[in-house]
A protein has these predicted regions:
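Internal intein/HINT superfamily modules and their associated LAGLIDADG
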Residues: 1-143
Length: 143
């Protein structure tokens, strides 16, 4: 399995040399979901807007900048969605950051794409449940 993953650019211990390569296009959303399951998060926070508390949605992937730019390009190509990259860590060997999809529309478009055609054997249950919670909250607040 280790050998199989290295042919796609997946290597242990982040060091700034990570890259994404040779992933068949038809599996790209599944690959990105798996990457996000390992190094991503889904946030639902409530912010006060005058008289009401409104939900704010955010989905993130953390990695080295090189991989984040590749993922950003892949997502732009597949669903015409561009997330924002924030650099938060620089070392001698690499810089790391987060690719963020913030807001109800952007976060949902990204999450719908990565969870489309997935099943419970292909995803982390607790992250998928957060996605389902997103759907419920969106239905309630953004009709």
């Amino acid at each position: 399995m280790f050998k199989d993953l290295t042919q796609y650019g997946i290597i242990p211990r982040k060091n700034g040399r990570e890259t994404i390569k040779n992933i068949p296009e038809k599996y790209m959303s599944h690959f990105i979901r798996g990457y996000a399951d390992g190094d991503g998060c889904i946030h639902i926070v409530y912010l006060k807007n005058y008289l009401h508390w409104l939900p704010e949605f955010k989905a993130e992937i953390a990695s080295c900048t090189k991989v984040l730019k590749q993922i950003q390009k892949i997502i732009k190509k597949h669903i015409d969605l561009e997330g924002k990259i924030y650099i938060h860590k620089q070392t001698k060997s690499h810089e790391g950051g987060k690719l963020i999809f913030a807001g109800a529309i952007r976060a949902m478009k990204y999450l719908e794409w990565i969870y489309k055609d997935s099943n419970e054997s292909m995803r982390l249950d607790y992250k998928y449940k957060k996605y389902l919670k997103y759907l419920q909250i969106r239905e309630k607040h953004f009709k």
